[in-house]
Swiss-Prot record:
It comes from the Eukaryota. This is Insulin. Gene3D superfamilies: Insulin-like (1.10.100.10). The lineage of its organism: Eukaryota, Metazoa, Chordata, Craniata, Vertebrata. GO terms for biological process: cellular response to oxygen-containing compound; glucose homeostasis; glucose metabolic process; positive regulation of protein secretion. Belongs to the insulin family. The keyword Secreted applies. InterPro entries: Insulin, Insulin-like, Insulin-like_sf, Insulin_CS, Insulin_family. It comes from Saimiri sciureus. GO terms for cellular component: extracellular space. Its main location: secreted. Pfam families: Insulin.
């Protein structure tokens, strides 16, 4: 996994991959789009959105 821009379905797919059965919370106010789509995010940053 390389730090990258993840938007739309690619972001959701990456969250499923990282979080697995734990699932994740997706709320626009959490900043995941700002962090991973507008900017570049890492695997570690994605894990912050797992349940």
């Amino acid at each position: 996994f390389v730090n990258q821009h993840l938007c739309g379905p690619h972001l959701v797919e990456a969250l499923y991959l990282v979080c697995g059965e734990r699932g994740f919370f997706y709320a626009p106010k959490t900043g995941v789009v700002d962090q991973c789509c507008t900017s570049i995010c890492s695997l570690y940053q994605l894990q912050n959105y797992c349940n």
